[in-house]
């Protein structure tokens, strides 16, 4: 699957990104490189390979679960353009 500049334009528009022509070209190349790598990975024969959750057998030692940050929602929402009932109000992007 290869994207076109029209696809990049649509993605940028939906993401509300304003890209220059050079940025669009660079994004197109990078996205197509990613898709090529994914396609290559999908073609790898994995028959007989046992699925695993983690590449290493050893489990990591985890720290105690304790609060390290305070609730800063009010501070963050104070600078937001619009907040209602502690929710950020954003422009609609997807058509109904």
From Swiss-Prot:
Superkingdom, taxonomy of origin: Bacteria
One Pfam family in the UniProt entry: GatC
Disulfide bonds: none
Enzyme Commission designation: 6.3.5.-
Coiled-coil intervals: none
Keywords: ATP-binding, Ligase, Nucleotide-binding, Protein biosynthesis
Keyword Ligase in record: yes
Swiss-Prot/TrEMBL GO biological process terms: glutaminyl-tRNAGln biosynthesis via transamidation; regulation of translational fidelity; translation
Catalytic activity: L-glutamyl-tRNA(Gln) + L-glutamine + ATP + H2O = L-glutaminyl-tRNA(Gln) + L-glutamate + ADP + phosphate + H(+); L-aspartyl-tRNA(Asn) + L-glutamine + ATP + H2O = L-asparaginyl-tRNA(Asn) + L-glutamate + ADP + phosphate + 2 H(+)
Annotated InterPro entries: Asp/Glu-ADT_sf_sub_c, GatC
Statement: the UniProt record of this protein carries the keyword rRNA-binding: no
Single GO MF annotation: ATP binding
Similarity comment: Belongs to the GatC family.
Protein function: Allows the formation of correctly charged Asn-tRNA(Asn) or Gln-tRNA(Gln) through the transamidation of misacylated Asp-tRNA(Asn) or Glu-tRNA(Gln) in organisms which lack either or both of asparaginyl-tRNA or glutaminyl-tRNA synthetases. The reaction takes place in the presence of glutamine and ATP through an activated phospho-Asp-tRNA(Asn) or phospho-Glu-tRNA(Gln).
Quaternary structure (record): Heterotrimer of A, B and C subunits.
NCBIfam families attached to this UniProt entry: gatC
Protein name (database record): Glutamyl-tRNA(Gln) amidotransferase subunit C
Organism encoding this protein: Neisseria meningitidis serogroup A / serotype 4A (strain DSM 15465 / Z2491)
Origin organism lineage: Bacteria, Pseudomonadati, Pseudomonadota, Betaproteobacteria, Neisseriales
């Amino acid at each position: 699957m290869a994207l076109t500049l029209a696809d990049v334009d649509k993605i940028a528009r939906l993401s509300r990104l304003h890209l220059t022509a050079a940025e669009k070209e660079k994004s197109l190349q990078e996205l197509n490189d990613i898709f090529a790598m994914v396609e290559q990975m999908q073609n790898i024969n994995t028959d007989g390979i046992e699925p695993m959750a983690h590449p290493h057998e050893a489990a990591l030692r985890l720290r105690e679960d304790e609060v390290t940050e305070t609730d800063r929602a009010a501070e963050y929402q104070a600078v937001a353009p619009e907040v209602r009932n502690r929710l950020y109000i954003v422009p609609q992007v997807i058509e109904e």
